[in-house]
Design a protein with these regions (language model features):
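Cytoplasmic helix-loop-helix junction between adjacent transmembrane helices
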Residues: 103-141
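Extracytoplasmic gate region of multi-pass secondary transporters
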Residues: 29, 209-249, 253-257
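C-terminal transmembrane helical hairpin of 12-TM major facilitator-type secondary transporters
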Residues: 272-316
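A late C-terminal transmembrane helix in Major Facilitator Superfamily
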Residues: 326-359, 367
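Paired small-residue
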Residues: 87, 98-106, 296-304
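Helix-to-loop junctions at the C-terminal end of transmembrane segments
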Residues: 60-72, 258-270
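Conserved MFS/SLC helix-loop-helix module at the cytosolic interface between two early adjacent transmembrane helices
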Residues: 61-95
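Helix-loop-helix hairpin linking two adjacent transmembrane segments in secondary transporters
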Residues: 133-185
Length: 393
């Protein structure tokens, strides 16, 4: 019975990510070139819509971090699933940049709810039932979200117009809400006695906290530019007009198992060294699409980027759970605010740069440079004296 409940909880969490992240957020990436062609969406406007999405995400993270009642978290999470469906349908029901921006903002709210409250509810259930405080299985839903949204857009775009595509995506989301809602267990308000020792909060030192926040801000910049614009970037390369979609699919396929693998790597070498390795590969993934003129660069970049971006998120959220096992959303929200600020600023800056240069390529160099600064933060964190044991447990 325990295994069955664990499986249902894990699957519900993954499906929740498919809805709030895959349909509400990641579908925008393969839809971006379609909307540029069919709806007249400009380069700069594409960046600003992404910024609106992350403004909603940032707002949602801030609000989620202020919620301490588990039952309230559960209710808001479930309604966040519905909001993801509504905001996706809005993209096809309006034909103005203002309407799209409102839709993207609401989608960002739902993504924050899915990432923050969904992850916290799943971790709460795992820890209160004596399981490891790891979210690798849960965050495999990030990679699956990329794959699902990409194929959904591909199959639909061959038969329908851009606005119909969004409506069909919202219908898919509505169908997925049913198992996501039904299979997620109700939160457990009190820890079982035999697991009480695992539920003691162990806050990080001020130095560790600041370095983690600085690194995660840099990781947010490193993530958002590629994840938002990769399809458009690759399609704009010489002789790559139709390759961008497949690069995005490869990225998602690489991400799907990555969180589980990074959990195993972190167990072996420690969380900080695992994050260092992931960050080096992440930088390579950002820059490789611009190397050479063939398929090697985009494909190798997608593999490196996909294998690392979700793993970084999963490991950072896992650390938050170890620091605050009774209130994992507490530090999750603080970290994600830093991540969210980066994701508000970077798309707008990339959109502005793209208007000046005529392409999104320069944004990749900026993202790689910022991610390199994040590497320095990790190296400093690695040298902090008396690093809390839970970082490398």
């Amino acid at each position: 019975l325990s295994l069955s409940l664990r499986a249902k909880a894990s699957i519900a969490g993954i499906i929740g990510l498919l809805i709030t992240l895959g349909i509400a957020r990641f579908a925008y990436t393969p839809m971006l070139p379609i909307m540029r062609e069919q709806a007249g969406l400009g380069l700069g406007a594409g960046g600003w819509l992404a910024t609106a999405n992350y403004a909603g995400y940032f707002t949602g993270v801030f609000l989620c971090g202020r919620i301490s009642d588990l039952d309230l978290k559960d209710r808001i999470y479930r309604w966040g699933l519905i909001l993801a469906v509504i905001s996706t349908a809005m993209m096809g029901m309006v034909a103005s940049e203002l309407g799209w921006a409102i839709s993207r903002f609401l989608a960002g709210l739902s993504t924050a709810v899915g990432m923050m409250l969904g992850g916290a509810l799943v971790m709460n259930w795992l820890m209160r039932n004596g399981h490891r405080a790891e979210l690798g299985v849960h965050f495999s839903g990030v990679g699956l979200s990329v794959v699902m949204s990409s194929f959904a857009v591909l199959m639909l775009s061959e038969h329908v117009l851009w606005w119909e595509n969004w409506l069909f995506l919202s219908l898919l989301g509505l169908v997925l809400v049913l198992p996501a809602w039904a299979w997620l267990p109700k939160p457990m308000p009190a820890p079982a006695v035999e697991h009480e020792s695992k539920m003691q909060d162990r806050p990080p030192t001020v130095a560790v906290r600041r370095l983690l926040l600085a690194f995660y801000f840099c990781a947010g910049v490193g993530f958002v530019v590629t994840s938002t614009f990769i399809v458009a970037i690759v399609n704009a390369l010489p002789k790559m007009e139709d390759v961008g979609f497949w690069v995005f699919v490869i990225l998602g396929a690489a991400a799907a198992p990555s969180c589980i693998l990074w959990d195993l790597i972190a167990r072996r070498v420690g969380a900080i060294d695992a994050l260092l390795l992931a960050s080096v590969l992440h930088i390579a993934g950002i820059l490789l699409p611009l190397v050479g003129e063939g398929l090697f660069g985009p494909i190798a970049g997608a593999l490196c980027f996909g294998f690392t971006f979700a793993g970084i998120v999963s490991m950072m959220m896992g650390l938050a759970g170890r620091f605050y096992p009774t209130r994992p959303a507490k530090m999750m929200s603080t970290l994600t605010i830093a991540y969210g600020i980066a994701q508000i600023l970077a798309p707008a800056i990339t959109g502005w740069i793209s208007e000046q240069t005529g392409s999104y390529n320069a944004g990749l160099f900026v993202a790689a440079a910022v991610m390199t600064v994040g590497l320095v933060m990790l190296l400093q964190l690695r040298g902090v004296a008396r690093l809390p044991d839970e970082l490398d447990s």
